[in-house]
A protein has these predicted regions:
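Active-site-proximal beta-alpha core segment in soluble small-molecule metabolic enzymes
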Residues: 6-9, 13-16, 26-198
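Active-site anion/phosphate-binding pocket segments in diverse small-molecule metabolic enzymes
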Residues: 2-11, 15-18, 64, 83-86, ...
């Protein structure tokens, strides 16, 4: 019998979340972001599940894109960070990869490449995140060079990324949008070109309808998790796709004053019943999860107690009416959002999902 720690991935919920993204911006193309192994959910399986409805897919690197091609995914694939070397441009052309262009080195590599067919190019414009992309003035020169190149398919897509779209109280998104729109307006007037546009990440899809342009880029929301720290009407419709599950493997009674686990960082204040669960930081469960982090056992919330080990955690089940070895445990999932666990741990759900190691089997349902 295999170890009972598994990540159950509900593909029906995945498709529902993607349909929500499409419905919120019906005039736009929605590109599922499947980078980082589809946020830990399994890039190939997720892409196959969405292949009938997705016009393209988004990844971080050419290695991820080639993995999808080798798995039989036929849609265009967007490389969000573009190419890292000149030889990747020819590989991109041969495989119908779309390239984000973030700097003049990447721009020149495309313009000067010897390739089999023109490439669809996304011109990254830095409107305020200050991480990647051309400054607006530099983007004019880059756009003109791309426009004049036979290596570039037309129209070119202008793109930017929001820094604070998940903060509804921030003025940063409106400021970035204004900079982007001014660039589009001036470039359209100067060139007469039709410039396709992409702005909306998950938070913008859910809450900033003015950002819904030709292409949108659902990521975190695709996997059923809200990018917001507070409630948001559209985000509340999302269904978590992954359920990290395990089982009770030991039950023991300890006396008041006895401690549990490495460093003895939790001491019972009463006679207690402790259940040991076969999951730990070797399975992606956060080592820094503090005492009191909720764990579901037989559908009931119970507090984590003691240090998280590589392969095990311990949970106080004193208040459970009945618990037995083999009982089902949920670490996060639809009944216990990964965002809640992340909040207890001082991190974000994105990190917990993407750090899920390969030793945890993914089980795909629906």
């Amino acid at each position: 019998m295999s170890r009972p720690t598994v990540a159950v991935v509900d593909l029906k919920s995945l498709r529902s979340n993607f349909a929500l993204a499409q419905s919120l911006a019906p005039g736009a193309n929605a590109i599922p972001m499947v980078k980082a192994n589809a946020y830990g959910h399994g890039m190939i399986e997720v892409s196959r599940a969405l292949a009938e409805s997705a016009p393209a897919f988004g990844v971080a690197s050419i290695d991820e894109a080639l993995t999808l091609r080798q798995a039989g995914i036929q849609q265009p694939i967007l490389l969000l960070e573009g190419t890292f070397s000149c030889d990747e441009v020819a590989i991109a052309a041969d495989n119908n990869f779309m390239l984000m262009v973030e700097n003049l080195v990447q721009n020149d590599a495309i313009v000067n490449a010897s390739i089999s067919q023109p490439i669809i190019v996304w011109l990254g414009i830095d409107t305020g995140m200050h991480r990647l992309g051309f400054q607006p003035k530099e983007a004019i020169q880059a756009y003109q060079a791309l426009k004049n190149s036979d290596n570039v398919a037309k129209p070119i897509i202008a793109a930017s990324h929001f820094a604070c779209a998940d903060d509804m109280g921030s003025s940063a998104t409106s400021a970035q949008l204004a900079i982007f729109d001014q660039w589009i307006k001036s470039q359209t007037l100067a060139s007469g070109d039709i410039i396709k546009q992409s702005l909306a990440n998950s938070a913008a899809i859910l809450a900033w309808p003015k950002t819904h342009r030709d292409w949108q880029r659902p990521g975190y929301m695709l996997y059923g998790n809200s990018p917001f720290s507070e409630e948001q009407d559209n985000a509340d419709k999302l269904i978590p796709v992954m359920s990290l599950q395990s089982a009770v493997i030991s039950i023991r009674c300890i006396s008041s004053g006895e401690s549990v686990g490495y460093t003895a960082n939790w001491t019972a204040k009463r006679d207690s019943t402790i259940a040991t669960i076969t999951v730990g930081y070797g399975d992606g469960y956060p080592r820094h999860a503090p005492n009191g982090t909720p764990v579901l056992i037989n559908g009931v919330r119970c507090p984590l107690v003691g240090r998280v080990s590589m392969d095990m955690i311990t949970v106080d089940v004193t208040d459970l009416d009945l618990v037995s070895i083999g009982d089902k445990v949920v670490l996060w999932g639809p009944e216990l959002p990964v965002n809640e666990i992340a909040h207890h741990c001082g991190t974000i759900g994105y990190e917990l999902l993407t750090r899920m190691p390969s030793r945890v089997p993914r089980i795909y349902i629906n």
